[in-house]
Structures are given as C-alpha cells and as structure tokens.
C-alpha cells in the first residue's frame, strides 16, 4: 500500500517537472542574428565544414553566436555555466587521432552532428531542448558558427575572465 502511494506521488511529480521543463525549454525566443555574412561564399548543408580554418568565417560566426546562441550556450561559446551543452566539446576527441584520414572522418561526423542539430533542433519526449534553425540561418552562417565554435578557447572559461588572459588574446 505504501509503495503504491509513493509510486503515485513520484509519477505526479515527474509529470509536473516535465511540464515545467517543457514550458521553460520552449520559452527561448529564437533571434535571427543581424550580421553581415556577405563575405561568406554561398554554401549548402553538406559536410564536412567547408569553412574550417577560415578566420573571417570564424569572426562572423562569433558575432552571430553571441547574438543568437549565447543565451543558452554561453557568451563566446564558453558554455561551462550555461543551461545548454558546451558546444566546444563536439568533435574534441578528433584532435587526438593520429591517422589523418581517420581524424578527417571523425571531424566529418562531428560536423554532421552539429549541422543536423542546428537545422532540425533537439526534441526528446515532446520537450524542445533546442529549436530548429533551418529557415532562420543560411547554411553558410551555420558553417561559420561551427568554425567559430571549433576555434573558441577551450577550458573552464575562468581564464577568459582574468586580465592577463584578456591581454594576450
């Protein structure tokens, strides 16, 4: 009898929490970034990232990120204290792969995961964890975001707050 009472209350609590999280997750307003992306070449949604290593694309991506993505993923992609995942971790393990062909394949998989998440968003059990951005972001701007995230400083984010780190950047 006591177990049934506990199970009933646990189920009601879970339903209540799911409703709260669903409301909060869907409450994030999508803001289309207002950046000049005219320097970027017209691209499609293909992988791997065609703008990898392009410093100008990374700078455009940083501006767009801080306008549209930082509210969930942290300013300058420093997502260690943010409600959403730290995007700098996507493909992090690829850097340790010694074989160039395998490393390139790993980066391609990470690019595919990133771009699919941006285009279609993330939804689990009816809860929107990330809204879809297809239609709001052009493919070239999405790839610029990826280029920025790949070049964003790694670490805890605490270093970026120190005056010494800011002076060396």
What are these regions (language model features)?
Residues 27-32, 81-89, 117-152, 157-169:
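Axial heme c-ligation environment in periplasmic c-type cytochrome domains
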Residues 31-64, 168-169:
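Electrostatic cytochrome c docking/interface patches
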Residues 54-78, 114-116, 145, 162-164, ...:
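Sequence/structural segment immediately N-terminal to covalent heme-attachment motifs in c-type
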Residues 58, 62, 74, 78-119, ...:
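Gly/Gly-Pro-rich "capping" loops immediately C-terminal to redox-active cysteine motifs
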Residues 1-6:
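N-terminal secretory signal peptides that target proteins for export/translocation
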Residues 11-20:
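Bacterial N-terminal signal peptides
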């Amino acid at each position: 009898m006591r177990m049934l009472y506990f199970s009933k209350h646990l189920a009601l609590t879970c339903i209540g929490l799911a409703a709260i999280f669903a409301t909060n997750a869907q409450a994030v307003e999508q803001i289309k970034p207002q950046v000049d992306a005219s320097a970027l070449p017209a691209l499609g949604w293909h992988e791997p990232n065609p703008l990898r290593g392009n410093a100008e694309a990374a700078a455009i991506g940083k501006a767009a990120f801080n306008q549209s993505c930082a509210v969930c993923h942290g300013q300058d992609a420093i997502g260690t204290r943010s409600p959403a995942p730290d995007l700098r971790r996507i493909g992090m393990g690829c850097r340790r792969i010694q074989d160039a062909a395998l490393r390139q394949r790993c980066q391609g998989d990470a690019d595919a995961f990133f771009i699919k998440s941006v285009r279609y968003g993330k939804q689990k059990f009816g809860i929107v964890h990330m809204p879809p951005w297809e239609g709001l972001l052009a493919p070239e701007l999405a790839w610029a975001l990826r280029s920025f995230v790949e070049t964003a400083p790694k670490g805890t984010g605490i270093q970026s707050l120190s005056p010494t780190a800011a002076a060396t950047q």
